[in-house]
């Protein structure tokens, strides 16, 4: 059977529980039509590049699907009708990616970066150019003597 990667975006004001129920509903449709979901990833609420249907953020969910084309057309039809789904995209792939997806690896990398602390150039002391050492003493101007 063909392999698909399917991503859908749910509205930001939908709760995590509602998104989980929507994911389970879609998974039920897939298994009911003879397909199977090999991996499900919830990427959480992320900012959108531009507004979609008056939303600036959305819940992102990835499904790896192994099933006939009729499965994909049916879940896309149901997502078109569902009011919580903003966008969806299904892509046919040659093989599914093993392990976490690129988005999950990026999230892990960002968490590691936050754990290091310090922010931008946190290892440096001082201001813009780091610690430059003490200033040299100022040379005094010669005193003007009036006669």
From Swiss-Prot:
Q: Name one Pfam family in it.
A: Ribosomal_S6
Q: Which GO terms describe its biological process?
A: translation
A Gene Ontology molecular function term of the record: structural constituent of ribosome
Q: How is this protein annotated for GO cellular component?
A: cytosolic small ribosomal subunit
- For this protein, the parts annotated as crossing the membrane are none
| UniProt entry keywords in alphabetical sequence | Ribonucleoprotein, Ribosomal protein, RNA-binding, rRNA-binding
Biased composition of type Basic and acidic residues is found at 97-141
Residue runs in coiled coils: none
The reply to whether Ubl conjugation figures as a keyword in the UniProt entry is no
Q: Which InterPro entries match?
A: Ribosomal_bS6 (IPR000529), Ribosomal_bS6_sf (IPR035980), Ribosomal_S6_plastid/chlpt (IPR020814), Transl_elong_EF1B/ribsomal_bS6 (IPR014717)
- What's this chain's function? Binds together with bS18 to 16S ribosomal RNA.
List the NCBIfam families hit by this protein, alphabetically: S6
Specify the protein name.
Answer: Small ribosomal subunit protein bS6
Q: Which organism is it from?
A: Nitrobacter hamburgensis (strain DSM 10229 / NCIMB 13809 / X14)
């Amino acid at each position: 059977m063909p392999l698909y990667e399917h991503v859908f975006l749910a509205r930001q004001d939908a709760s995590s529980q509602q998104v989980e129920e929507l994911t389970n509903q879609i998974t039920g449709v897939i298994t009911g039509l003879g397909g199977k979901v090999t991996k499900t990833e919830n990427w959480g609420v992320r900012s959108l590049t531009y507004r979609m249907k008056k939303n600036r953020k959305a819940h992102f969910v990835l499904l790896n699907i192994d099933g006939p084309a009729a499965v994909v057309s049916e879940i896309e039809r149901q997502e078109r009708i569902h009011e919580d789904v903003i966008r969806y995209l299904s892509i046919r792939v040659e093989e599914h990616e093993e392990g976490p997806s690129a988005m999950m690896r990026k999230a892990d990398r960002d968490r590691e970066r936050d754990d290091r602390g310090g922010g931008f150039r946190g290892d440096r002391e001082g201001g813009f150019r780091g610690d430059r050492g003490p200033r040299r003493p100022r040379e005094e101007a010669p005193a003007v003597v009036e006669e």
